[in-house]
């Protein structure tokens, strides 16, 4: 039985963009435990192509993120071809990868919160070293500290500079994580359900920050099940279901009642107000 919903015939996959590839997956398969969680996933995201990967819990979103960040590895192809490339490369040192592709995930937040006595400034500085603390043997320069203040100001979190990281609210944490992801001036940001746990005001601040970053030329790759996070600048939408791509097309084609109802397995109603989308179940 094919899991591909009927609306796939409606969606028109976007043509390849003549830009350097940000992410390339070629028949990527991932097994976690004894379960195959990604099935022959083929996907190309170009630099400058803001993209949202959308789907229900268990559709493979977290496995996709861990595949890109090299926390999971794909099965080897029998023909020796490469299954995953990021910025054109298939071999990365983790610290170099994360300096080019900023990462904002819930796992990262939890790891930082577990560091005793960590301040916001130290949390953001740790982004320079792809670690959860500032290594004792590494020098922190004045330029680094200035860049920390710059990115915190961009996300509206500069007043938090000397606060303890573990004391922050969910909204404050998200602003600090985005600032941390920006310290190395990455070409792109990978955002994992960034509005989870945020109140209405914090969510609106997050949306405004995302739009600012998109306008500055930072490519956004959003992984979520909240369509409210899909800002207008994100034109490409990839729907995931059961570890496979169910549809790949434009936001106008896919962020609608029918496609979302099919991929989420129940009736979904999409309402648009002043350019903002909201989804309701039932």
Where are these regions (language model features)?
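Conserved ABC ATPase "signature" region
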Residues: 125, 139-160
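Conserved ABC ATPase signature
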Residues: 138, 164-168, 172
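Conserved catalytic motifs of ABC-family nucleotide-binding domains
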Residues: 185
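Catalytic Walker B motif of ABC-type/P-loop ATPase nucleotide-binding domains
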Residues: 189-193
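H-loop/switch region of ABC-family ATPase nucleotide-binding domains
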Residues: 224-225
């Amino acid at each position: 039985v094919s899991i591909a919903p009927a609306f796939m015939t409606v969606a028109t996959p976007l043509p390849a963009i003549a830009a350097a590839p940000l992410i390339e997956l070629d028949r990527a398969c991932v097994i976690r435990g004894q379960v195959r969680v990604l099935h022959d996933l083929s996907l190309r995201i170009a630099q400058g192509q803001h993209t949202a990967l959308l789907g229900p819990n268990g559709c493979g979103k977290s496995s996709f993120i861990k595949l890109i960040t090299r926390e999971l590895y794909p099965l080897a192809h029998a023909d020796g071809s490469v299954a995953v490339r990021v910025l054109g490369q298939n071999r990365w040192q983790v610290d170099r990868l994360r300096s080019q592709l900023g990462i904002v995930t819930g796992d990262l937040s939890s790891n930082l919160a577990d560091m005793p006595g960590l301040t916001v400034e130290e949390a953001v500085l740790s982004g320079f070293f792809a670690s959860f603390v500032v290594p004792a043997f590494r020098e922190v320069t004045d330029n680094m500290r200035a860049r920390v203040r710059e990115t915190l100001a961009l996300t509206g979190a500069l007043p938090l500079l000397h606060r303890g990281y573990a004391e922050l609210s969910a909204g404050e944490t998200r602003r600090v994580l985005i600032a941390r992801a920006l310290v190395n001036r990455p070409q792109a940001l990978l955002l994992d359900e960034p509005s989870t746990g945020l109140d209405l005001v914090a969510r609106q601040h997050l949306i405004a920050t995302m739009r600012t970053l998109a306008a500055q030329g930072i490519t956004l790759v959003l992984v979520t099940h909240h369509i409210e996070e899909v800002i207008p600048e994100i034109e490409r939408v990839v729907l995931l279901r059961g570890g496979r791509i169910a549809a790949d097309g434009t936001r106008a084609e896919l962020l609608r009642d029918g496609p979302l109802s099919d991929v989420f397995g129940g009736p979904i109603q999409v309402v648009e107000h002043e350019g903002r989308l909201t989804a309701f179940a039932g």
